[in-house]
């Protein structure tokens, strides 16, 4: 594909408007921003848009819990999101909201076209209904016992213990996660998008090169299982757009969310007098790219292109999918302080450090990326401070002091300069293909060559010898020329460092002008371009993150407590189980155990892994109380009560050799049973 005169529209996935941006979000936005900045440097017409995903039940409920309107909540969150992105130098041309008139108009238009073309069906379905809140419950707002493995406190769509999927109506003893009430089953008419009608088109499009091979292979699993009609409606009360021609039906958030890409661009078109249809018409020859995470790839690879096709719009040119971010080899953890919010990072560290580190580890595959904090410090200090910036500083002083800031009028080593310029197209190809890690390795290899050149020439030795002034100027100028080329190559990754370098060089860095050296050119006095990272900064950030997450958890619990009724109703309690005999009870062997070690099970949202001392032996027990204990290590040393003669059970995440007793309704409302001081591990509960 030609690199000239391309017309490109780029989007990032829309962050949900009910919580802060964290470093996991930033991977995608940094990846997209680097690609966009590179395209701008190449002279292409490119538009970069995003928006907040601002509809849905979670937003409605959170606003109610906070005592504000959903509109107030999403406005506050959007302001914070945009500030975080600006802090990381994400160069959006427009940042909008799905709760906008542009999105309402486009959602209604696409729905009407799909309906006219026969792709909208309706039928009556059975749903769980909260009688206290008078609302139908989405899958994730119902909890109960898994119908397959009987694990308690599972969501309404899948079990996190045995991985089974099911309907909310199949849950045993279901309860509303909103009010705690027992839901009832009610019927309601819903509207469905006829996804199976697009199977042939989707199969062809999925294998057309529009998706990474790993994504296309994953989508094949959906085709093998058979595509199903997609429920695009929700019942009132719901925060979103009402479906035209209905009284109490709303578009499901995942219908209007991707349309938010179009809405944000349409808002930009109004502001800058751009042609919206040129980018979205079915016969458009412009390019459209979505950067997204692997958790939402099926929406973008199946539902979204089918919606566009059915509504007579163009499909994406390509969807670029990335993996998750881990920290120090583990899932981001609030208790360990590695669930780091973007705003917390910005209070302690330069955003360009993270931009560089992510770029150095990014490829065009969907592998997860590990933010190893020790490696992070070492790589930034070695590559950016010791090698790159030092290349400029070790030469600039001589140019400023001995030659009044004037560079030599010719290159000292034309072949070396030519070698650096010759790598331009290879580095450009890496950027184009999102192989940022390969681009960084190539650039740093050139940086090593530049520093070796200076080391071999030893300008500090030349400076001490009379009659070698011209040679000194030529050598130091050559070092500056090479630094300029390197900074040009790194400009998409490090825009602020590039900006400071441009001020020092007194010249703009563009991809095309790098081949023309700055001969007989004046540069500004050198000032520090980049600061070294200190481990103490990392430690301070982690501690701040721990404190902030703890404060948020405390606030959430307080809000939830205040939102509940002040007096308990009899219906709040589970009924007493059928009577058993004393002989039945005698079969249960309850023992006191001491917690030796307690840690999260990273792959599970519910489980903690305990290593217990029963006095006579040690055992491993998996317990679904993660929601109640954010700092599992704090449980170490505590005594708990265990069902000791329960048969070992093989679970998805390991073998559990017993059951720890706790009381409560589930989730965060769980409390471990305690024992008086003096009891020993292994003591039997009588």
From Swiss-Prot:
User: A GO CC term?
Assistant: cytosol
Which GO-annotated molecular functions does the record name? ATP binding; metal ion binding; methionine-tRNA ligase activity; tRNA binding
Instruction: Extract the PANTHER family matched here.
Output: METHIONINE--TRNA LIGASE, METHIONINE--TRNA LIGASE, CYTOPLASMIC
Q: Which cofactors are reported in the record for this sequence? A: Zn(2+)
Q: Which residues bind Zn(2+)?
A: 146, 149, 159, 162
Q: Where does ATP bind?
A: 334
State which Enzyme Commission number(s) the record gives. 6.1.1.10
Keyword hit for Plastid:
no
Where on the tree of life does the source sit, at the highest rank? Answer: Bacteria
What keywords are annotated for this sequence in UniProt? Aminoacyl-tRNA synthetase, ATP-binding, Cytoplasm, Ligase, Metal-binding, Nucleotide-binding, Protein biosynthesis, RNA-binding, tRNA-binding, Zinc
Q: Which residues form a coiled coil?
A: none
By sequence similarity, the record places it as follows:
Belongs to the class-I aminoacyl-tRNA synthetase family. MetG type 1 subfamily.
Enzyme's top EC category: ligase
User: Its principal location?
Assistant: cytoplasm
What is the protein's name according to its record?
Answer: Methionine--tRNA ligase
Q: How is the cofactor bound?
A: Binds 1 zinc ion per subunit.
Source organism (scientific name):
Mannheimia succiniciproducens (strain KCTC 0769BP / MBEL55E)
Catalysed reactions listed for this entry: tRNA(Met) + L-methionine + ATP = L-methionyl-tRNA(Met) + AMP + diphosphate
Where do we find the motif 'HIGH' region here?
A: 15-25
Q: Where is the tRNA-binding domain?
A: 584-686
Instruction: Give the residue ranges of motif 'KMSKS' region.
Output: 331-335
Report the locations given in the UniProt record: Cytoplasm
